[in-house]
């Protein structure tokens, strides 16, 4: 039997990786195994080998054709890993580039991955802004409340298009400040 392929997305700073890690820990205690793969890290490893970027945050500033090629390489590699295993693909529905939004899962990526579920991790834009300001480990572009809200809205629209193409379902999981456990519970219920 094929494993479940779940794409978990969210704008930078929403805490999607934190929610994923919490859900995986909880599921492991129940004997439900998932492998988490970060799509951007997979792309970055290819970019680094080709001397295209020295950190993940530089990738969104690469030429669009280069980003597309890196996406394809990541999709092919991740699809080959999935097989019968349950897999979580930690990624972004859209990536904000200097020339506009780039679909994180364009048609050629979706064709390779064919996810069962797309999860959008969201929270209030002001919470995301504060998280970004407190994260010195990343070189993120500074955006205000309105830009973050627009990015989340655009992610919803793009995710609906992903569902139209693949037939997957969409689930929104909230990662509110001080309510991480509730977000983890919601993701666990989808992953079971």
Curated annotation (Swiss-Prot):
Gene3D superfamilies: P-loop containing nucleotide triphosphate hydrolases (3.40.50.300). It is found in: Cytoplasm. Keywords: ATP-binding, Cytoplasm, Kinase, Nucleotide-binding, Transferase. Its EC number is 2.7.4.3. It comes from the Archaea. GO terms for molecular function: adenylate kinase activity; ATP binding. It catalyses: AMP + ATP = 2 ADP. Its main location: cytoplasm. ATP binds at residues 10-18. One of its GO terms (cellular component) is cytoplasm. Belongs to the archaeal adenylate kinase family. This is Adenylate kinase.
